[in-house]
Amino acid sequence: DNQRPITCLNTMYKWYTSCLLVPTDKHLDDYDLMEGAQRGARAGCSGTMDNLLIDRMVTLDCHRKKRNLSMGWVDVKKAYDSIDHGWLEEMMIIHRFPTWLCRTTKYLSRSWSTRIVVTTRNGREASEIIKFRKGLPQGDALCPRLFTVCLNPIAWKISASEGYRLSKPIGTTITDLLYIDDLKIFAASESKLSSVMNSVRAAMEDVGLIWNPKKCAVAHFKRGVRVPESTGLLMSDGNVKIPTLEDGQQYKFLGVLETLRQEEKIVLRCAAREYLRRLSVIWSSPLSDYHRVIASNQFALPAMSYFMWTQHWPITELRQVDRDARKIVTEGGGKHPCGTTSLLYLPRDKGGRGLRSVETEYKETKVKAAVKLYQNRDPAMKMVREFEEQAESKGYQSMTKEAGKYAEEYGLQLQLKHPDPVCVTEEGEVVPGDKLKTRLRKLRESRMEGVVEEQKWQGKLITARKEDGDLNTEQCFWWL
């Protein structure tokens, strides 16, 4: 049951399906056929970030306004491997794709096959060709889009439900969050949630998708407080029961642990533990110092940076994570115990080590997240903008408030106006949103250089090298 074979697709097939993806997306965009709640496999859309922001908005609205809310999380067994090919062909016709594209997809689905090759002492032995009678291969560009097309009618059905209506003055209804096959359903009561989940389960079985009850869950809240006597959700056929989240139990949705609200403290603790674990592996390895830093920035740091876009963490705890990280680097020989901390985060071409700070990464991510929120043209994100502005005006924790505070530390003033937010420097220069990342990096490096220049030991040495006319600064640091 736990086997999930992945077939290695050849390069020409991947290139061919990438070419087919262009007219497929164009047809869906031109006729607005994709349900808006489906934010997976969509070009130019940060699906997980958008869904988590909407999820945070709904749960905070329930908590702050003492509202009734029922939520259901749905997990599907081997979703990609279960799509019926007949349903795929029917969906291509229902969505009125061009005839040539329907025929091509039909031909591809009927030609999907593989073979198992085993290397033994007697040589290589190959099995007969194994035909795929159902399911979509993983690894090409087209199949994720075909999968979302197959789920489109289910998304339409959920969007027709009553859902959960946000408090005034927003007052918009949220029915569900969908990212590929990760589904979360909202309802105003337990009975309404039961009705929606029964209809969704029946519709998914028509597609060939089977729920995994052990990984599904429901939670009910009245006046913002969890209902303790809830015993779970019994499906209409009486054979499947969806368990209720118990006290102290969380559900992981799109990588974030949550109950009524997203558990930001637990997420930070788990992310920091994984980040430090990866750092320990990297700095105890035989890699060179340069590659250790690259691995730390590109392998270890993403364990935390993924959550920074949507979570709100205390700066004091992030500074503690940085201290623990520097301790690991020092024990691994990447920093002298008496060495200056600033040089550790200064770029290598300027005499530093090039490591990225968790605190700095968090602050810059918050500024970029606020700008990205106001650049987003998704109609659903308008609600998030209004919610964040309303939270800021009432003194609640807000992304826009945090972003403005952190931008001021870089000498920038945020002007968040949809759809073209900008930053204004102290000199009055206007920085558009698409150039903000580069400007933040330059300001960070400039500020770090200023800190290093004030140091009386290593900083003085670095500054002397830069000011010495007989030395080439670039050649001095190229070996780093």
Residue ranges and their predicted role:
Residues 78-95, 136, 176-205, 222-225, ...:
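Catalytic palm subdomain of template-directed nucleic-acid polymerases
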Residues 321, 336-480:
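Extended C-terminal regions of large enzymes
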Residues 200, 318-330, 403:
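Short amphipathic alpha-helical coiled-coil/interface segments
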Residues 237-315, 333, 367-383:
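Basic, alpha-helical interaction scaffolds
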Residues 210-249:
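Short, conserved micro-motifs composed of acidic
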Residues 45-48, 110-116, 216-230, 346-351:
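Short, conserved secondary-structure transition motifs
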Residues 1-153:
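Conserved pre-catalytic core of RNA-dependent polymerases
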Residues 22-27, 51-63, 192-208, 272-277:
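Inter-domain linker/hinge segments that demarcate the starts of reverse transcriptase
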